[in-house]
Amino acid sequence: MSTFEDADTEETVTCLQMTIYHPGQQSGIFKSIRFCSKEKFPSIEVVKFGRNSNMCQYTFQDKQVSRIQFVLQPFKQFNSSVLSFEIKNMSKKTSLMVDNQELGYLNKMDLPYKCMLRFGEYQFLLQKEDGESVESFETQFIMSSRPLLQENNWPTQNPIPEDGMYSSYFTHRSSPSEMDENEL
C-alpha cells in the first residue's frame, strides 16, 4: 500500500478551451460534441475536426463541412516547457481564418493563446491554459448562444464564402455602402 509521500506528483495539463457558435446550431450540428466536460489526449495525437466520424475526433453534422476541415497538433517550442498548438487547414474548398490570417489548403500556423477561428458560418474562440505536462493535453467545448464576433468585440467580418475565397470587393470595404438599383 502506497503512502502519501510515495505518490507521484500530479502535473497540471494544458487545456485548449473552445467556445463555438453557428447560427444553425439548434439543428444538431454539434450533437456529437460533449460540451463542458474535458477530454484528454496524448500529446502525440493530432486532433481532427470535420464531418467524417471515422477519421475525426470532433465531427460536425453539416454537409458543407469537409471530411477533415482542420487539424490541431500539439508541439513544444524550442526552449519552452509548455505545449503549444499549430492549426492546419485540411479543406480544399474553404479557407480558414485565424484572427485575420487566412489559411488556404494545407497552410498551417502556430495558434496564439487566444484567437478567433472561422470558416463558413462557424466561429470558434480558442483559449489556451498552460499546464506542466508535455505528455497530454485536454480540450473543452462551450457552446455560445450568441455570435462570438460581437460578444467578444472582435472586428466584424463577412462569413467565408463556399468557394473559400474572399472577394476583394468585400475585404476592402470598411463600411456598408448604398447603391442605386440602376447601378446593378
Swiss-Prot record:
GO terms under biological process: cytoplasmic pattern recognition receptor signaling pathway; innate immune response; positive regulation of canonical NF-kappaB signal transduction; protein homooligomerization; tumor necrosis factor-mediated signaling pathway
UniProt-annotated stretches for the region Disordered: 152-184
Top-rank taxon, per record: Eukaryota
Domain FHA: 47-103
Modified sites of kind Phosphothreonine: 9
Keywords: Cytoplasm, Immunity, Innate immunity, Phosphoprotein
Subcellular location, record wording: Cytoplasm
Entry coiled-coil feature ranges: none
Bias (Polar residues): 168-177
InterPro entries: FHA_dom, SMAD_FHA_dom_sf, TIFA
UniProt free text on domains: The FHA domain recognizes and binds phosphorylated Thr-9, promoting homooligomerization and subsequent activation of NF-kappa-B.
Protein name in UniProt: TRAF-interacting protein with FHA domain-containing protein A
